A protein has these predicted regions:
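Positively charged n-region of N-terminal signal peptides that target proteins for export
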Residues: 1-4
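N-terminal signal peptide c-region/cleavage motif recognized by signal peptidases
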Residues: 13-15
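Conserved SGNH/GDSL esterase-like catalytic core that processes O-acyl groups on lipids
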Residues: 33-35, 42-121
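Short hydrophobic segments within beta-strands
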Residues: 37-38, 141
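Extracytoplasmic/secreted envelope proteins and their assembly/folding machinery
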Residues: 49, 53, 121-128, 162, ...
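Alpha-helical cap/lid subdomain in secreted, periplasmic
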Residues: 91-205, 217, 226
Length: 261
């Protein structure tokens, strides 16, 4: 009965959606440990969690990302493929007893049909309940859209992605990290920038850097602008500043916050 009610709510939400805004605009507490769960969107380019932890290590003197930021990924996976309950058990990953924050990243195809979106909504709810049962805060990672070289490209796909993640975030009262909207904003400003691989789906290095900046701004509630980390010189000073500003602007716009960056 509970599943039927949840499915009905998801269907009603998608059928009546107009412009929606996220209801949760910040985490309850600043995390000291973070687990990313997802697929190749996370592990490409030396893994997003490594870039995120290097940014956090630089900005926060007492943050120990090497010890407390981890990633569990399966190539090509959707949310349903992850055994979240096992991953968040004490010492299931390294020596960490309990993560403060678990970030869930869904598969890119989970937005392509109504049945896919319903399954995403149901699975996200199940995982979020599992995470909360361990007194861990959950969050959702909004994925980016495909580019034209991908067979499933559609000009307005990002709107469907935005709606699906925002609705799920509001339904479950969790923070949504607007990575997909940051990609959209960056391409609007600099259409020539290479955020995707040639396959039109996976992130290139600059896309991963932008995603890490967006996660940083969302999770910590602080601007990434001014962070020196550039992946050992692999991100130019111009691109670094541009992506940092885009990430913060996207977060401000999505959460309805004020800010000059």
């Amino acid at each position: 009965m509970k599943k039927i009610l949840l499915t009905s709510l998801i269907l009603l939400s998608f059928n009546t959606v107009g412009e929606i805004a996220p209801e949760i605009k910040a985490l309850k507490d600043t995390p000291k440990s973070v687990l990313f769960i997802g697929n190749s969107y996370l592990y490409y380019n030396d893994s997003l969690h490594n870039h995120f932890k290097n940014m956090a290590n630089e900005r926060f003197a007492k943050f120990d990302g090497s010890k407390n930021v981890k990633s569990a990924t399966i190539g090509g996976s959707r949310l349903k493929h992850h055994d979240v309950e096992r991953l968040i058990q004490p010492r299931a990953i390294s020596s960490i007893e309990k993560f403060d924050l678990v970030i869930l990243q869904g598969g890119s195809g989970e937005v392509l049909s109504e049945s896919d979106r319903i399954e995403f909504g149901e699975t996200a709810h199940q995982h979020i309940e599992t995470i909360r049962s361990k007194d861990i805060e959950p969050a959702l990672y909004m994925t980016h859209a495909y580019t034209e070289s991908h067979k499933d490209y559609a000009p307005n796909l990002i709107r469907s992605i935005e709606e699906m993640y925002t609705l799920s975030g509001n339904t479950n009262q969790v923070l949504v990290i607007p990575v997909g909207l940051a990609f959209e904003a960056a391409y609007k400003e600099r259409p020539d920038m290479k955020l995707h691989k040639l396959d039109g789906t996976h992130p290139d290095l600059l896309g991963t850097y932008l995603a890490a900046c967006t996660v940083f701004a969302s999770v910590f509630g602080e601007s990434p602008v001014g962070i020196n980390y550039d992946y050992n010189g692999s991100v130019s000073a111009e691109d670094k500043l541009f992506l940092q500003k885009i990430a913060q602007l996207t977060v401000n716009n999505y959460y309805g916050l004020s800010g000059s960056d």
